[in-house]
Amino acid sequence: MAAELLEQPVLGSRRLSNILVAAMVTIGGVGFLFASLSSYLGRDLLPLGHPAGLVFVPQGLVMGLYSIAAALLATYLWAVIAIDVGSGSNRFDKQAGVITISRRGFRKPISVEIPLKDVQAVKVEVRDGFNTRRRVSLRVQGRRDMPLTRVGEPLPLAQLEQDGAELARFLGVNLEGL
């Protein structure tokens, strides 16, 4: 039974890099808010610098607008992290003859079912340079290639090759792209 089913978890947006970016945007937004309030009130609310010396119009006002923009961006980033957008699984079931690719979307879950007989090959794509892309995808008859790897940080090349070869062996199809 275990040889008939392969399930691969996919990491979503709940990663350390995303949490650090959201924290930095939050801290920066709070800093701009305190600088704007310091300029408006005429006394320093920040331990660094001397923001009370800034003229409220236009400098303090612009910093207040920056703090609002940072608050909106931080709210979006924390919501994406809390929902864990992009997480899910790839489930390959030989017994049922179906592949189920499921991901958590922003508003609702996304699930795609592909008949096992429509899979032509497993494709490993490696593109280095400015816009690096390393992914494993399924070449499906009558459809675009279906990506299986997570979005964001590229996988190490050795792990990418191993995952592609293991999946091609399990499905009994060719491995392309190496």
UniProtKB/Swiss-Prot annotation:
TM spans (from-to): 19-39, 61-81
Kindly list any coiled-coil regions of this protein: none
Localization in the cell:
Cellular thylakoid membrane
Report the principal subcellular site: membrane
Membrane topology type: Multi-pass membrane protein
Q: Which GO terms describe its cellular component?
A: photosystem I; plasma membrane-derived thylakoid membrane
Q: Name one GO biological process term.
A: photosynthesis
Which keywords accompany this UniProt record? Membrane, Photosynthesis, Thylakoid, Transmembrane, Transmembrane helix
Q: Which InterPro entries match?
A: PSI_Ycf4_assembly (IPR003359)
Q: Which family does it belong to?
A: Belongs to the Ycf4 family.
Q: State what this protein does.
A: Seems to be required for the assembly of the photosystem I complex.
| Name by which UniProt lists this protein | Photosystem I assembly protein Ycf4
UniProt source species = Synechococcus sp. (strain WH7803)
Gene name per UniProt? ycf4
